[in-house]
């Protein structure tokens, strides 16, 4: 009988192999887009609502990191006021416009949107 640990690692490995096969072209396009931003002295903004904002937080540069990353963090679309309030805000059409204006996302910048479901008005 295999152990749960073996089952876990086998599952993770099979998912990584599938990701490499299925998402390679998209990942390569993302790399090229980020490289273009670096070469044009732009910034990489990352935005997510609800729990997806954690990904944006993780991109914030640290010592030795890529200092062109800018997480877009706003209380209205995070879960800090509770999941119900966050859900209402992230489903409000137009809520992101003023947020992006405040951050000054420009033509040479890249905006990465993180979404668990892809169904909300925000972003």
Role assignments for model-derived ranges:
Residues 22-40:
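A short, well-structured juxtamembrane/interface segment
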Residues 1-22:
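Generic N-terminal amphipathic, Lys/Arg-enriched alpha-helix
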Residues 8, 15, 30-33, 95:
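A ubiquitous structural signal for well-ordered alpha-helices
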Residues 4, 26-29, 51:
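Short, contiguous, pocket-lining structural segments
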Residues 11, 26-29, 122:
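Charged catalytic carboxylate motif
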Residues 42-123:
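Glycine-rich phosphate-binding loops that contact phosphosugars or nucleotide phosphates
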């Amino acid at each position: 009988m295999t152990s749960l640990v073996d089952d876990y690692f086998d599952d993770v490995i099979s998912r990584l192999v599938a990701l490499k096969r299925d998402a390679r072209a998209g990942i390569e396009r993302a790399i090229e887009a980020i490289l273009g931003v670096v070469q044009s002295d732009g910034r990489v903004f990352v935005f997510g609502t609800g729990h997806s904002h954690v990904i944006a937080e993780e991109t914030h540069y640290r010592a030795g990191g890529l200092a062109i990353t800018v997480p877009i963090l706003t209380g209205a679309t995070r879960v800090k006021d509770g999941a119900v309030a966050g859900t209402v805000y992230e489903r409000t059409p137009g809520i992101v416009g003023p947020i992006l204006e405040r951050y000054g996302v420009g033509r040479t910048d890249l905006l990465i949107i993180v979404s668990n479901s892809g169904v909300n008005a925000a972003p």
